[in-house]
A protein has these predicted regions:
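Conserved SAM/AdoMet-binding glycine-rich loop
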Residues: 39-43, 250-352, 357-365, 369-372, ...
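Glycine-rich beta-alpha loop elements in corrinoid/cobalamin-binding modules
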Residues: 87-206, 398
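Flexible glycine/acidic-rich beta-alpha junction loops that bind and position SAM and/or redox cofactors
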Residues: 78, 147, 326-329, 357-366, ...
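Histidine-anchored nucleotide/phosphate-binding helix
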Residues: 23-28, 51-63
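Short connector loops at secondary-structure junctions
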Residues: 66-86, 142-145
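Radical SAM enzyme core and accessory elements
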Residues: 1-25, 39, 407-476
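N-terminal [4Fe-4S]-dependent radical SAM core
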Residues: 6-38, 45-46, 197-241
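Terminal amphipathic helices with adjacent charged low-complexity linkers/tails
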Residues: 164-167, 171-174, 185-233, 272, ...
């Protein structure tokens, strides 16, 4: 029984994050449900509702007879305290059931830094994966550079790439397992035989077939027919759609989806260099829905992509360029400069140059060359446009934090009155540690959760003082 009242919710910020009831939410009759799935995103509702994999799985699983997927998100600090004070476990948005009531808990693993939130959500649900009475815990991984071994003590199953495997193989076999009353070990051995599915208690070092699975993933994934649309006015919820070359079918599917959901913000991902077809699709969508906002994720700015930028209005938003200090080539620098000038000439008001420094074999000569280039950009474009500079540290195993700090200081001194936002060194260090296979990671995650360290949004807003103190305690 839920111990949180409406009066309790009035005391927290954004209570609609926890109430559910959105347009497009799926509710099923209890008599129809054979397998319950807790679909978990280890960050705030605001972030998870814009995650492609989460929305895809929600639509896929709930379109299947006998399966019911309900959403769980990382609670903000205010309601986390409320849950603890009321002795209330984390609950789903749809039916307010606790995670222990589900057969499966699927966590969408998007960023290593969110490992901490995964552990926190399980703690708030009073779930220990060693307890046979709890749900089977699955990690859904899209990034093939992801190293699951640091989470082997938490997860029962990892799935790489092909999301349809969740239903076609894992849940289908579970239905057979339940009906025939087979042992859980027999079930897990069966699952481990599936390509790109890892059961760590059986074979954590199983080879992942990256290339074949990536190709199949694009073929298998179709546009989803139903998603919840957020009730929170401050959330500019967008619909993430995988682009494909069959633009007529894609157009028809998108139009149907807009009619069903009322969503007005589209974001295309996995876009190819077929700019002509992409532009045709965008023009037809805008003709049908003039107020539709369309963006293309990670679309590199160039002469070929210019018309898409101007037609969608993306030209007036941040135009991003990225550069790595290591082994910068003159041809690359000239191309970036020409692209920046082209963007400004066509109305760009905001340029964002993300600078990556800190590679293990990087030299100060690399940084010198980089700083000269940045100063040149500032001289050319500052009159016409706002240029935002940010530094991301490429912390690698073997790097010395003190050396990176010295490089940061060197870069600041070389840049003439240019304002930079620098990534926090402790955050960079944490991300690198979590990426590196290490038997001590579970202890670090547990310590971080107990220390009150949380990741509350996509900008990685966490208590860096607590993080620094944690490193000192663990002598890291």
């Amino acid at each position: 029984m839920l111990n949180i009242t409406k009066n309790d919710l009035t005391k927290i910020k954004e209570p609609l994050r926890y109430t559910g009831g959105e347009y497009g939410e799926v509710i099923k009759n209890e008599s129809e449900i054979q397998i319950r799935v807790a679909l978990c995103y280890p960050n705030l509702y605001d972030i998870g509702m814009n995650n492609y994999t989460t929305m895809y799985l929600y639509s896929l699983l709930n379109s299947k007879k006998g399966i019911y997927a309900e959403r769980f998100f990382m609670p903000d600090l205010d309601i986390e305290k409320l849950l603890i004070n009321n002795n209330q476990n984390l609950f789903s948005l749809e039916t307010k059931k606790e995670m222990n009531c589900f057969d499966f808990a699927i966590f969408v693993l998007h960023d290593e830094i969110e490992y901490i939130n995964v552990a926190c959500m399980l703690k708030l649900s009073k779930i220990n994966n060693k307890d046979s009475k709890g749900p089977i815990i699955i990690g859904m991984i899209d990034n093939f550079e992801f190293k699951h071994c640091n989470l082997d003590n938490i997860f029962d199953i990892f799935v790489y790439g092909n999301k349809s495997v969740i239903y076609n193989d894992i849940l289908f076999r579970y239905g057979v397992y339940k009906s025939q009353k087979l042992s859980i070990s027999d079930y897990l051995y069966s699952i481990n035989s599936i390509e790109n599915v890892v059961v760590p208690c059986i074979d954590s070092n199983k080879k992942i077939e990256i290339e074949n699975k990536l190709q199949r993933k694009i073929q298998d994934e179709k546009i989803f027919p139903m998603i919840p649309v957020s009730n929170i006015s401050s959330i500019n919820q967008r619909l993430n759609i995988k682009y494909n070359s069959n633009i007529l079918k894609l157009y028809q599917d998108i139009i149907k989806l807009i009619k069903n959901t009322g969503i007005t913000n589209l974001n295309f991902i996995d876009v190819t260099n077929d700019y002509t077809s992409m532009l045709m699709l965008i023009k037809n969508l805008k003709k049908s829905y003039p107020f539709l906002k369309i963006t293309i994720q990670n679309l590199l700015f160039s002469q070929d992509a210019l018309e898409i930028y101007t037609y969608t209005g993306m030209i007036s938003s941040n135009i991003n360029f990225e550069i790595f200090s290591k082994s910068i080539k003159r041809k690359e620098l000239d191309y970036i400069m020409e692209s920046i000038e082209l963007a400004i000439k066509n109305g760009a008001k905001k340029i964002h140059l993300k600078v990556n420094i800190g590679c293990i074999d990087e030299t100060y000569h690399d940084l010198e060359k980089l700083s000269c280039f940045i100063n040149k950009i500032k001289e050319k474009v500052s009159i016409y446009s706002t240029v935002k500079f940010s530094v991301k540290f490429c912390y690698e195993v073997g790097c010395n934090i003190e050396n990176i700090e010295l490089k940061e200081k060197f870069l600041k001194e070389k840049l003439n009155n240019i304002s930079f936002s620098f990534e926090d060194i402790n955050l960079v260090k944490l991300r690198s540690i979590l990426k590196t296979p290490n038997v001590n990671i579970p202890a670090l995650i547990d310590k971080a959760v107990n220390s009150g360290i949380r990741v509350y949004n996509e900008n990685l807003d966490l208590d860096l003082l607590k993080l620094k103190k944690l490193f000192m305690e663990l002598e890291m």
